[in-house]
Amino acid sequence: GGYVLSRAQRDRIGEELGPSEIQITEDLFIGPTTLAEREGGMMHLNHSCEPNLGLQGQVVFVAMRDITAGEELTFDYAMTDDEPCEMECRCGSDTCRKLITGRDWLKPELQKKYDGYFSWFIQKRIDSTK
């Protein structure tokens, strides 16, 4: 769950909460609006370079493989992010990229790996270059 936020709303809320949203279009995001919502787990999914979840459409997460009971649910931020940002990755996977950026979706190897699992607005951009 979460609230649909404009870029301006996301920027204002982000000053207090830090990054806690998922980008769903070029200019819209979904996320919590208060610290209590964020701390309560709203929109809390961690990144992994070997995720078990992908996206269908804008906000529906689906399993990309079988997930065992108790396994953490993760997705690759490359599936949703198109913002100028950087984050050190410590996911521990064999394919860890070490540095995650808001432009990782441009990498051909990730486009191939996650084809059909990107947020629709990113998938549309990728498909237009094929």
Each predicted region: which residue ranges?
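Catalytic cores of histone-lysine modification enzymes
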Residues: 1-53
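C-terminal SET catalytic tail plus cysteine-rich post-SET Zn-binding segment of SAM-dependent SET-domain
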Residues: 47-130
